[in-house]
Design a protein with these regions (language model features):
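Active-site-adjacent loop/helix segments that line or gate small-molecule/cofactor pockets in enzymes
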Residues: 137, 164-178, 212, 231-242
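Core alpha/beta nucleotide-donor-binding catalytic domains of modification enzymes
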Residues: 1-122, 130-131, 135-151, 250
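Basic, glycine-rich polyanion-binding accessory segments appended to enzymes
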Residues: 185-188, 192-255
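Residue-level signal for well-ordered, solvent-exposed loop/turn and beta-edge residues enriched
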Residues: 70-72, 160, 198, 253
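Short beta-strand/strand-turn micro-motif
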Residues: 152-170, 183-190, 241
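Short acidic, glycine-rich loop/turn motifs
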Residues: 77, 156-158, 235-237
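Short, catalytically relevant binding-site loops at active-site mouths
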Residues: 137, 161, 168-171, 178-180, ...
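Conserved beta-loop-beta connector loops within the AMP-binding
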Residues: 119-122, 158-164, 196-199
Length: 255
């Protein structure tokens, strides 16, 4: 039996992906897909059919902690850890998910797949977004929205115009390559102003920051803190962990 969740996928994942890029942000559609489709519609359907849980091939682990009364999400224990794309799950969702590949390495999984005669055993790894073709996300956005991206100005941090960009959806914070303009020395995207249709560029060192604002928070393993707590954090996949201070703010975000 095939469960058709294509409309949910389009509405929750693809539409949101396009909206975020055109607002000057860089989304992670896998996070949204896991929360709303794989462990949203699919998990709901499984439970309605009387099943206890859904098992997937994510490299992660979930376990119940009787001392805190909470389900905790753990890293997959391998170089292919995928726990970061599962952070948006709720306690109710985690209670009904199993991750049988936890603690295994990718080559172990491939070997088991070969033994079972599965045709995907030697399929290459993919880090690409599943619904974006090889032409890249910019071309996809133009096709999906039916409108070409609007050119605008590259500016420095004082507002001085440095050149022209080909649409804010083509750029992301920290980007240096592929700007399409030669500036004589390295320039990095430090901010995207969607309201003004401007891409703000800075020189070496200006692409770093000592703090950030985080939203869409999920305190999976702990009760939401009332004050600052010491944590380790990483700002992107495969970046090293770093000590940090998390300060909850009144609007539900955190610094």
């Amino acid at each position: 039996q095939v469960l058709d969740l294509s409309e949910d996928f389009r509405r929750h994942v693809v539409d949101a992906f396009a909206q975020e890029y055109l607002a000057g942000r860089t989304p992670n559609p896998c996070v949204v897909c896991n929360r709303t489709v794989k462990f949203g519609g699919m998990l709901d359907y499984a439970l309605e059919q009387g099943m206890d849980c859904v098992a997937t091939g994510h490299y992660a682990h979930a376990a119940y902690d009787p001392e805190t009364g909470r389900w905790k999400l753990y890293r997959g224990g391998s170089a292919k850890d995928q726990s970061y794309v599962l952070y948006g799950l709720s306690q109710q969702q985690l209670a009904h998910i199993r991750f049988p590949l936890w603690g295994m390495e990718k080559e172990q999984v491939r070997a088991l797949a070969r033994e079972a005669g599965l045709p995907v055993a030697d399929k290459g790894d993919s880090m690409e977004i599943c619904f974006v073709p090889k032409g890249g996300h910019a071309a996809f956005l133009e096709w999906y929205t039916g409108a070409p991206m609007k050119p605008g100005d590259f500016v420095d941090e004082t507002g001085k115009v440095l050149g022209r960009h080909q649409g804010i959806g083509r750029y992301t914070i920290g980007q240096r390559k592929g700007l399409g303009v030669a500036f004589g020395r390295p320039r990095y995207v430090v901010r995207i102003d969607a309201a003004r249709n401007e891409v703000v560029l800075g020189e070496e060192g200006r692409q770093t920051a000592s703090s950030l604002l985080a939203d869409d928070l999920r305190y999976l393993s702990i009760v939401p803190p009332c004050g600052p707590i010491r944590i380790t954090a990483r700002i992107r996949y495969q970046a090293p962990d770093a000590p940090a201070l998390l300060t909850p703010l009144a609007d539900g975000t955190a610094r």
